[in-house]
């Protein structure tokens, strides 16, 4: 029988005991050092009054948002998007069954709640019609006929990672919708998916600027020469930060992004808070005419509605100049729209939400006889079928979403878009994190999200008794008022009588 080497075992225990003692001593020393640092520093009162343990306050504050999201928040409590909304998009993007059981968890009595009016004789499946395409820019040399009523809103390469842009581009092509470049310029990754593209011109004019930073006609022609580029959008303001230019932190300005934008790498990319060369409504119409003349393609603008007297002035000026001078479309962004980075003071308090601004703009265009000439695009937290159907009822011709498609890519609402450490690889340029986002897989999810959203918007339309979603009108929906009773949207937003239509006017 072999006798155990007790000497080796004893030595091992001695080493282990010594290691534990040294480790304990180092921990005590570290606590003493932290204690001294805390009581001598003057910047933070908690650490000075409660040395050492005061650090736990910051730790718990940081992880608290994750506990709230995963353990404590109810399905319809979170902001900006609750779990019910996110889950619908996740399942739609994965092409999974999106039915639920037992009953709705949505409260139907709070003021502002939207209710659709079902028809006693809903549209039969065999009577349903395909969503009709709509032509934008009938006065242009190259008008654009858009098939999908739901499309990808502006998100720039820079704010988004390379694989995210690749997935969106390929998915949009499969889903039959357009993708907006955002204000960061046209990247090769926007083009490689072969989707229809809306090129956005921001206040810094990235991608179409000359050496002095001004709009270049030659650069416009270069961009317009790509057959995938169908329209141009002048970004006047953004929902999350009206009056503030785009912000891309220097950590996200790589050499490639800097080259596309024409700026130094590694430095913060901060756009002017408005277009320096657009000082009036006349300047805006002149800029639209200039870009349309140079490119031959539809041109519109994106804006958050706040001071709304200018809308009547704009329409009056358009009618004075003639319908050809009008923007081919207007994108209405909501005050609760998304962003990669914005001051909280603007994000929380500036501008009107789309539920107020969209009917206002639609009515203003109708009043001036321009609703058929100028197509309306709604944007801002419209990520589910009900929200899209509401926008169609109120007067939108198209709906665009950014964060809805981010959820389709796998976004978990970590709220780290501005920190370059997005855990899903969508808004980071960290290669290690980007590898989690496989463009070919996520492109399928983008396409499935488009397919399933359009399908369920159709389900709502058929329940309302119309053959396709574009036939939805204000009388098909109601809104709960303060007294708990619902009011028809046709009563709440009484549409103005339209003067003579300009739809019959053709390019001469």
Label each residue range with its predicted role.
Residues 2-150, 154-178, 184-194, 199-240, ...:
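Conserved, well-structured core domains of diverse proteins
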Residues 176, 226-249, 308, 313-328, ...:
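Carboxylate/His-rich catalytic cores and anion/metal-binding grooves
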Residues 182-184, 297-302, 327, 371, ...:
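Flexible, glycine/charged-enriched surface loops at secondary-structure junctions
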Residues 199, 205-207, 250-278, 340-355, ...:
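Glycine-rich tight-turn/loop motif centered on a GG-T
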Residues 209-236, 353, 362-363, 374, ...:
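Phosphate/diphosphate-binding loops
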Residues 226-261, 413-432, 457:
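Mobile "lid/hinge" segments at catalytic clefts and subdomain interfaces of large enzymes
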Residues 270-434:
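Glycine-rich phosphate/ribose-binding loops and adjacent secondary-structure elements
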Residues 411-474:
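Active-site or pore-adjacent capping/gating segments
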């Amino acid at each position: 029988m072999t006798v155990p080497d007790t000497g080796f075992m004893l030595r091992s225990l001695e080493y282990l005991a010594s290691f534990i003692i040294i480790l304990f001593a180092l921990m005590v020393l570290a606590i003493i050092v932290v204690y001294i640092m805390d009581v001598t520093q003057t910047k933070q009162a908690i650490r000075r009054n409660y040395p050492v343990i005061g650090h736990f306050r910051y730790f718990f504050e940081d992880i608290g948002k994750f506990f709230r999201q995963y353990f404590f928040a109810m399905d319809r409590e979170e902001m900006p998007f609750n779990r019910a909304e996110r889950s619908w998009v996740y399942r739609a993007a994965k092409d999974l069954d999106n039915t639920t059981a037992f009953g709705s968890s949505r409260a139907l009595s709070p003021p502002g709640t939207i209710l659709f009016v079902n028809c006693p004789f809903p549209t039969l499946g065999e009577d349903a019609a395909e969503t009709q395409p709509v032509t934008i820019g009938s006065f242009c040399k190259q008008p654009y006929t858009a098939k999908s009523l739901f499309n990808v809103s502006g998100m720039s390469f820079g704010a988004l990672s390379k694989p995210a842009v690749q997935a969106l581009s390929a998915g949009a092509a499969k889903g039959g919708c357009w993708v907006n470049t955002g204000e960061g310029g046209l990247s090769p990754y926007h083009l490689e998916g072969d989707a229809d593209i809306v090129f956005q011109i921001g206040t810094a004019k990235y991608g179409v600027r000359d050496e002095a930073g001004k709009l270049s006609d030659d650069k416009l022609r270069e961009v317009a020469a790509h057959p995938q580029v169908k329209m141009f959008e002048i970004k006047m303001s953004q929902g999350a930060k009206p009056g503030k230019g785009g912000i891309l932190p220097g950590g996200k300005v790589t050499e490639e992004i800097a080259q596309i934008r024409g700026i130094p790498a590694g430095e913060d990319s901060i756009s002017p808070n408005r277009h320096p060369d657009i000082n009036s409504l006349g300047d805006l119409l002149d800029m639209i005419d200039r870009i349309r003349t140079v490119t031959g393609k539809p041109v519109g603008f994106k804006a958050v509605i706040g001071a709304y007297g200018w809308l009547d002035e704009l329409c009056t000026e358009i009618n004075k100049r003639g319908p050809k001078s009008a923007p081919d479309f207007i994108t209405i962004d909501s005050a609760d729209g998304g962003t990669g980075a914005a001051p909280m003071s603007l994000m929380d308090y500036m501008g009107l939400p789309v539920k107020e601004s969209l009917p206002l703009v639609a009515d203003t265009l109708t009043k001036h006889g321009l609703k058929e000439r100028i197509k309306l695009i709604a944007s801002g937290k419209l990520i589910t079928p009900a929200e899209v159907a509401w926008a169609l009822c109120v007067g939108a011709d198209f709906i665009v979403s950014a964060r809805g498609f981010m959820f389709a890519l796998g976004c978990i609402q970590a709220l780290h878009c501005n920190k370059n450490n997005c855990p899903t690889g969508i808004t980071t340029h960290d290669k290690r994190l980007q590898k989690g986002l496989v463009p070919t897989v996520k492109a399928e999810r983008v396409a499935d999200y488009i397919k399933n959203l359009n399908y369920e918007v159709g389900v709502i339309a058929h329940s309302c008794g119309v053959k396709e979603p574009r036939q939805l009108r204000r009388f098909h929906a109601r809104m709960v008022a303060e007294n708990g009773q619902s009011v028809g949207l046709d009563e709440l937003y009484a549409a103005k009588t339209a003067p003579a239509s300009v739809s019959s006017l053709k390019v001469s």
